[in-house]
Amino acid sequence: LAFDDDKNTRYGVRKEDECGPVLNTGMFFAMKEMGDVMGTFVGHEHVNDYIVDYHGIALAYGHFSGWRTTYTREINGVRVVLLKEGQREFDTWLHSLDGAIRDRVTYPTAFIND
């Protein structure tokens, strides 16, 4: 839902559908209610590596970090997250095994739509 909504700023790629749970446990609502959650970082969708702002919370995938799958030729790497002490802000980017860095953004600054 978050990635599909053109109003939501996003960086990175989506190459396969997300596998959300069948049961809505209210986790996202609880994070919103807490008021101090800036983002959540997940993996498993092997070739998704995007970050999107959804109602003031960054939803971010890591990067393909395993080794060889039967259906992708993606080079492995990681999502780096650099928290800024005392600020409600973080930097994040994708760093591939070959040294390439892409989609370097500062949250929430890069996601503010004027």
Language-model features: locations:
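Histidine-centered catalytic micro-motifs
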Residues: T40-N48
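Binuclear metal-dependent phosphoesterase catalytic core
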Residues: R10-C19, T25-M34, N48-D114
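Metal-dependent phosphoester/phosphodiester hydrolase catalytic core
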Residues: L1-G12
